[in-house]
Design a protein with these regions (language model features):
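A cross-kingdom marker for long, charged
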Residues: 214-263
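Bacterial N-terminal signal peptides that target proteins for export
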Residues: 1-8
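N-terminal Sec/ER secretory leader and immediately downstream segment
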Residues: 23-129
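Short, charged, amphipathic alpha-helical segments
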Residues: 103-107, 127-128, 167-170, 192-199, ...
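Non-transmembrane, amphipathic alpha-helical segments
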Residues: 71, 75-82, 90-97, 101, ...
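Extended amphipathic alpha-helical interaction segments
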Residues: 132-215
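Bacterial N-terminal signal peptides
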Residues: 9-18
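Secondary-structure edge/capping motif, primarily at the C-terminal ends of alpha-helices
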Residues: 90-97, 116, 120, 155-159, ...
């Protein structure tokens, strides 16, 4: 099995998907995973989480791909959320080894970065994504996707747009969680469901949205996402059942759709 990963990074999260041929573990102990610290929140590195996820089965990554609607005009809040979701989609496309989709996502990242004024930051990386995808160099593509989003985050912070950087991270987390729940739902196990047990991380995002300036916090899309996170919270603060996985998938799917359409 190819070793691969999905990333949705920036200030808050790197989501990685990795696979390799080993026997499934008898039990997943998240407390033993390598961890990363996000302010006061310590969470398992998602790359390790997805190493375990792939041990539990062989996901159909091509089947998890979607066709996002790229809107490079509109409110910066929507564009920032969409940028994170698109990069998360890029790593799904890498998992599927879909050259055409990865190349299109590279162009989409550039278009969205242009819309929020940080095009020059990612130009060389997006060109590299397209070139390396054509060559089938997936390790390099993942590295460039990771770097592109990190560069965007740093540029936003330099421009005093840290709030937008949080939204980029959140957009990636939402799309990544939608994919994760879809995969777990198709082959449910308690160990797989345990990977969704991230209450501190969810609280982190809720607090970032609550602390935004009123003009952003009261944005229709941000309000919708805040409500969605509030719905997810009780579902991951208890034993995660097949019903909980299904409901989290529905909620995150609705939020990702709202990001695409601003519905």
């Amino acid at each position: 099995m190819n070793r691969c990963r999905i990333v949705f990074v920036t200030t808050v999260l790197v989501l990685a998907i990795s696979g390799f041929a080993e026997a499934p573990p008898n039990h997943i102990d998240l407390s033993k995973f390598p961890a990363t610290q996000l302010d006061d929140v310590v969470v398992p590195l998602p790359s390790e989480v997805f190493n375990v996820l792939d041990k539990l089965g062989t996901p159909n990554w091509q089947g998890e791909l979607r066709e996002p609607v790229i809107r490079n005009r509109g409110e910066r809040t929507q564009i920032a959320l969409m940028l994170g979701a698109v990069v998360a989609e890029g790593f799904v496309a890498v998992e599927a080894a879909d050259k055409g989709r990865v190349q299109q996502i590279g162009r989409d990242v550039l278009e969205l970065a242009r819309a929020i004024g940080v095009e020059s930051t990612v130009l060389s990386r997006t060109n590299s994504i397209i070139t390396k995808a054509d060559a089938g160099n997936w390790v390099a593509v993942r590295r460039e996707l990771d770097g592109a989003l990190t560069d965007v985050k740093n540029a936003m912070i330099e421009l005093k747009d840290a709030q937008l950087a949080h939204l980029v991270s959140l957009g990636g987390w939402l799309r990544g969680t939608e994919v994760l729940t879809s995969v777990v739902q198709k082959s449910y196990s308690e160990d797989g469901a345990d990977l969704l047990n991230q209450p501190d991380l969810l609280k982190y995002f809720q607090e970032r949205l609550a602390g935004m300036p009123p003009r952003m916090r009261n944005n229709q899309l941000v309000t919708k996402i805040q409500k969605g996170l509030d719905e997810i919270s009780p579902l991951i603060n208890q034993k995660i059942t097949p019903g909980s996985v299904k409901r989290i998938n529905e909620i995150t799917g609705q939020m990702v759709k709202a990001i695409d359409t601003r519905a």
